[in-house]
Amino acid sequence: MFILKINKLLSVLFLSLILHGNSFAQLSKTDVDKAIDISSLEHPYLYFNKSEKKELLKRISEDQESNDIFRKLKAQAKVWMVMPVDKNIPIQGKNTRANWSEEDRNGKYSGYYKTNLDNAYHLAFLYQMTGEERYAQKAFEFADAFCDLTTWTQRAHEFPVIYSRIMPWNVPDDQVNFNFDHFNGDAGRMMAAVYDWLYQALSQPHRDRIRGALLEKVVTRVRGDYEFHWWATAYRCNWCGVCNSGVGLAGLTLLKEHPQLTDIVAESYNRINSMFNELGEDGGWQEGGGYWNYGVHTSSFFADALKRLTNGKHNLFNNKRLKDNPVSFPLYLSLPGNKSLNFEDSGGYGLIGSPHLINKLATETKNEEAAWYRSNFLEKGDNIFDIIWPRPSSLGVPPKNPSKHFRTIDWWVMRTDFMNPNKVIVAGKAGKNDDPHHGHLDIGHFVVYWNKEYFIRDLGRSGYDEKYFDEARFEYPEAASSGHNTILVNGEQQISAKYYKQPYDYSIGGEVLSFQSSDKVDYVLMDPTKAYPNKELKKWRRSVVLKKPEVTLVLDEIKSTSNAEIKVRFHPGVEVEIYEKLVMLEGKNGKMALIPILNQKFEINQGRHTSQMVNGTEKFKWIDYFDIEVNSRKEITNLITLILPVKDFEEARQIVAAKSMKIEKNGSIKINLVKGEDDFEFFFEMKKEGLIYKK
């Protein structure tokens, strides 16, 4: 009996590891030593070797996309080849995110940093593709200037600016060492390639110049000291991938001279694998799309190099969480008009994923949805890695359902079609308020996107000043719940699960209770109750229904004391006209009406957030919103909001006049409305826990 119990326990533990995606054992230095034949290595070897270079040259010759990238690079090199390389390092400002001084504002240091690094990198690649040593010598001039920098870490991430930042998940609060940041990780990754690509053309002193810089500014800052770097265990943070990739690639490129560096190669593998394990079971990433891209993109360079050097034995692309859903997140967050959902600090200004990254993920995982995303959404490549990592051979196959619930992070997207801008997209999120790094207090929030515009929007991120990552971030409207399309009861706002040097409270947040999708209707039910202190808001359930392709209905069930002031907040992304019984939203290519449906008196009132970055040059701005306001008459208040396209105000007025709401004795609710020749019915059945939408 005892043995049976032990076997059962071991089976459960094994299953939980597999389900979580932790499909690899920890890699040791010995494992790497056995897998890489260091004696056979000959530069270049990170991303291609001498033999494989022939295939790249053939691709440049025969593939128009690759040929265009290469010809553009050669044309740009005409400038770089005659550009003087300035050895006078500009002064770096002490507060580059506050812009107090001229050095903070002028951008000379960051320009110097970027120019020398980028030019060395691209000229080194040109040398490999042409064999012309003039490119190698000029690349070294830029590399030499970059190596002369005292540090490759930038001021915004050094003490004392970053000291007061709230530490992310799995990171101890007591952090005082900040000598390696994501800029340093990027620099390590790129300079590792410069060393690899220039090696054969350089004299020993020139090789040693770059080798010494990689050791001084990358390897010795981290090797043996991982416990003193906060990002080393921040597996839900993009920094983990960026920094570990840079360190690992520095180790790989220096293996001939320093074979002992297989220890940091193993460390990078293990830590990046742990980051990949934190991808959601559907591919979601809590920080948002932009930071999914940064972490996965930079990690893919290390993953590719290590896979090559170990002949596929140690392949991070086989991580279960990554392999099962390599591009689900960027695909489902995509919006017509070359945009993406901008929840959290993720930006949303373009589609997610560099073409070469999606090429690589699609090829390595053989995922047809990834190939379809590459061939149907992204533009032509314009990066040297679009030559090294070419398009997948398949054009791919679209997902069967364009709607998605990312279960691990509880984000959701409801839509009729990926490509058609004339069909409404509704998206929102629940989940936990436990990402103090890039998360917002936005549980229960949603947006409405149509005709390439947000009609109901997310404010996106604030500019990154010196306080935005401190506890003060939750006072910025961009991060506070008051700056999202949520509920306020007597002004009560959502709270964070993590504050500065305080323990996490993982109970704070919300959840998706139900997500259903079909050809004709999508439905989500969220419970954001525990995102609040619950002194005023006792309970909140939000149902969102999309009757495809364009009619959205939102039902908010709010429990509070009687006579509480309840506000349903909306942030418009277009022009707004407030009327007594409805709101007109006018975009560039169409109009929508937002119509409250209530059985009690309500008001629609406009307001404005104040928004001011802590920055000497950033201007103050107002941010518009409007509220549907009611005073609760009893413990439970039901507020219904209809959002749909209309021709004009007259059609909206007719919809208001024809709508009806019936509340049955058991509390079930039926809403009927007419739009033109179409009739719509929404029925919510009362259950023990609240109202449930029934098709």
Regions inferred by a protein language model and the residue ranges of each:
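Active-site lining segments of carbohydrate-active enzymes
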Residues: 172-290, 386-400
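Carbohydrate-active enzyme catalytic cores, enriched for enzymes
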Residues: 254, 291-455, 513-521, 631-634, ...
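Bacterial N-terminal signal peptides
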Residues: 11-20
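CBM-like, beta-strand-rich accessory domains located in the C-terminal region of large
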Residues: 25-26, 467-695
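Solvent-exposed loop and edge beta-strand segments that line ligand/cofactor-binding
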Residues: 29, 45, 98-116, 155, ...
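Well-ordered alpha-helical scaffold segments within catalytic/enzyme domains
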Residues: 43-64, 117-134, 138, 144-151, ...
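Low-complexity, Ser/Thr/Pro/Gly-enriched N-terminal "stalk/linker" regions
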Residues: 27-103
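Long, well-ordered core segments of solenoidal/helical folds
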Residues: 73-87, 139-157, 209-230, 263-283, ...
